[in-house]
Amino acid sequence: LWGGARASAVERDAAGAVREVTFVRDGAEQRVRCRHLIVADGVRSELGRRLGRKWHRGEVYGIAARSYWRSPRAREEWIHSHLELRDADGVVQPGYGWIFPLGDAPVGGDPDAAAARLRGGADAGADAPGAGGSAAGWVNLGCGALSTAARPAKVNTKKLLSHYAAARSEAWTLGEEQHVTSAMLPMGGAVSGVAGPNWALIGDAAACVNPLNGEGIDYALETAEQVVALICAAGGDGGDLTAAWPALLNEHYGEAFLLARTLARALTHPRFLPAVGPLGLRGPAARVIMPAAARLMGNLVTDEDRDLVARVWRAAGAVTKAARAGSPLWAPAEVAPAS
């Protein structure tokens, strides 16, 4: 395991198969030959871009900022979401805020020290900013908004993050802000060029991010398992992933992602959320709507579920997929973005 290295270049043969990847760490260069390459380098996916990934920004995408804070509530077992996200002027934003308790998980710093911390090594904790005897652990606090090329979100996410953190500071006894970052997130499979003869993009790199809440951890774990199973099932050289991997992603997530993208697109209309939000969050229907929304946003509807919410979700997904058959969904690179 060579932690903290950056993949800087790939060498491909005439058929497009990756034969060698060049990694750089602390100025040292290492070339690694490979039979298969699984790319999991996040939403920006620099290696994915080198391999031909294209992001279709006509579809809904997220803009988000996150930070880490010391908090005595870091060991809580619940993730907190705030769906009515307002800016400093009180204007409702098409997004939400979150607080993920992380316990004593390592935050930032040197990758080797972080790995040692996870292993419980003697130098554990050396990487964490602010470490030094504090009983408080860490929480991930962030916020995000939805956007499209036609209706870009007009919000400074870092300013919104500061406002959101200030609003939650007393309840969470937040310490000093650490490691603020922001990014744009392709969502719901709105990318093309995610596979080649012996390589595949997974997780955030393949836009396997829920368009309704920006969540992608479970999709990252699932797609990692799925691509390994696909390669192993083919035997021998692992088969050609160029069409097989997008087809598998489409089978598992296509209907749900297209439906979620369609619903998320509605949230980018300026008048939609102020009109509908209060009904779902505080109206008489909230007791029904909010549990169902949390379930759908959490990717908790399985193929085995037969209740009303699951049936309606699957039926709506099938209808949406048929109606938006031309929308980019891990599509060939020549497919144009949705208008």
Segments and roles (model prediction):
Residues L1-W172:
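Predominantly flavin-linked oxidoreductase catalytic cores and closely associated redox partners
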Residues R6, L51, T223-L230, L263:
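Short alpha-helical scaffold segments that flank and stabilize functional sites
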Residues A28, A65, I79, T181-A183, ...:
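Glycine-rich, flexible loop/turn motifs
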Residues G48, K54, I217, T223, ...:
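Residues in and immediately flanking transmembrane alpha helices
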Residues R49-R50, L212, D218, G277:
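Short, function-defining helix-loop hinge/capping sites that tune catalysis or transport
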Residues P106-G133, S147-L230, G236-T242:
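FAD/FMN-dependent oxidoreductases across multiple families
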Residues A229-S339:
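C-terminal helical "tail/cap" subdomain of flavin- and related membrane-associated enzymes
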